[in-house]
Amino acid sequence: MPRAADVSRISRLFPQGAAPPAWLVVALACAGQFLVVLDVSVVNVALPSMRTDLGMSAPGLQWVVNAYAIAFAGFMLLGGRAGDLYGRKRMFLVGLALFTLASLCGGLAQDGWQLLLARAVQGLGAAVLAPSTLTIVTSSVAEGAARARAIATWTAVGAGGGAAGGLVGGVLVDTLSWRWVLLINVPVGAVVLLSSLRWLPESRAGDRRRLDLPGAVLVTAGLGVLAYGISQTEAEGWTAAATLVPLAAGLALIALFLVVEARTAAPLMPLGLFRARAVSSANAAMFLSGSAMFCMWFFMTLYAQNVLGYTPLEAGLALVPSSLAVLLGSKSAPRFMPVLGARNVAVIGTLLAAVGFGWQSLMTARGDYLTEIMFPGILMMLGAGLTATPLAALATSGAAPGEAGLVSGLINTSRTMGGSLGLAVMSTIAAARTARAVGGGGGTPVALTEGYALAFRTGAGVLLGGVVLMVVWLPWGKGAGPAVARVSGVSASADGDVVVDVVDVVDVVDAEDAEGAEGAGPAVASDGAAATRFEK
């Protein structure tokens, strides 16, 4: 773990006033990104321990994940815009400080509401911090092969954070307590904060568009209230005022968000972008697929610990093959796209994930690891990895070159928003089915299994619906070959372009490996995914 002594040692190597080497700037930006991505997945294995210690309800447990995800999705684009206006270093520091402080508060929480509030503030801090990390990387390294390698490092660190989350969380919960999945961020965050304060260079964009704070607040509040209304259906039913009022309020807030976006001069989400078929269809497909795939880790962790009796560490180890499958899928997708076409790769990936969800829905209370966790988990996450990259490429193909970063940020936002609402729906479905099973005399492990199985069956159905949507609506075309990752520091930050978790990792090809790419070739999205041409 980094220590203050390490900072002092580096200080002697790079005195105040001297320009820090690019590798140090890249390392600090990647450290911030690692913390953000790690926190998406590290809490999953700690959920049963959190529930026991803080007395949280089963439906309420979803909010440990959703409080972070909704705040992150709602403010991510705003965080990128703030970096352009007020400086990327400044927003990096503000976001990291907020994230670190919230981690401390969450780790010390004595009640469920305190933990959920801390997780929401964590998500807000991550939304401010994360968009600046990629821009800091691209602005510190000269364009060309060196920048491509720096971006590859950044994506690899993000992938590593997502893949390592379950294992790191399992070790911390088993050896210390669930609180350390949050408290571990404090010393690491403090060292990165002090180092960044001293060595990160400041930069900002020439674009002086104002912040769309009302838009960010409205969409975040709308999603949160809508998710709360959905979760109320399990206990109150669909016709109770406790359900109908938040559902109506959430929909009204989202409608008001759309009105604000249509009328403001500098909208958070320019609605005109969705006139392009590629942009609208890819975002809809990502929203739908994300609503199912986002839930996989949540339910798999609960099944492993609550039903099969795994320890947190064993649960983390059990999901390592699934984490590696995501990496394999996301690395393989760009190689298949030039041959099969981006739409076909996305369809194949979603079908694979649907098969995995269907297989997982056959789980039993005496589940075998190979056939009821590992193999279906690999299929689900291999499909997730194969799906995300072509959808991102399709979306950016429908945007003007100057809007590629914005569209890439939107596709990440769509996935996270879909995931947060999907988790609310599926948690409610699982809890209702479990309650009915218990009422019918089923044992607790059996009842829990029935609830989790129904959630996976629902996810399989949603993914099959996503396949139909992709076949009917997505434009068809074959992806371009390898391309140079030419990333604009302005667009990457301005539009909140950020890898949210391992599912969004894209393949970045070194410049020296791209034949004839310099000065020509396909446009490239600011996340490194080749933006290809498609017939509309």
Question: What is each stretch, according to the model?
Answer:
Residues P2-A31, L382, A393, G443-K536:
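Transmembrane-helix exit segments and adjacent C-terminal regions of multi-pass membrane proteins
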Residues D111, E143, D174-T175, L197-G206, ...:
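Transmembrane helix-loop junctions in multipass membrane proteins, especially transporters and channels
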Residues A22-V45, A58, A241-L253, A262-A437, ...:
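12-transmembrane solute porter fold
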Residues V94, A146-G158, R208-L218, T243, ...:
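Cytoplasmic-side transmembrane-helix entry/capping segments in multi-pass membrane proteins
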Residues A152, D174-M286, A292, Y310-T311, ...:
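Hydrophobic transmembrane-helix bundles of small-molecule transporters
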Residues V36, V65-Y68, F72, F99, ...:
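Structural signature of transmembrane alpha-helices in multi-pass secondary transporters
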Residues M50-R51, A82-G83, V168-L176, I230, ...:
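Interfacial helix-cap and linker-helix signal at transmembrane-aqueous boundaries
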Residues P2-R198, L340, L351-A354, G358-S361, ...:
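Transmembrane-helix bundle of Major Facilitator Superfamily
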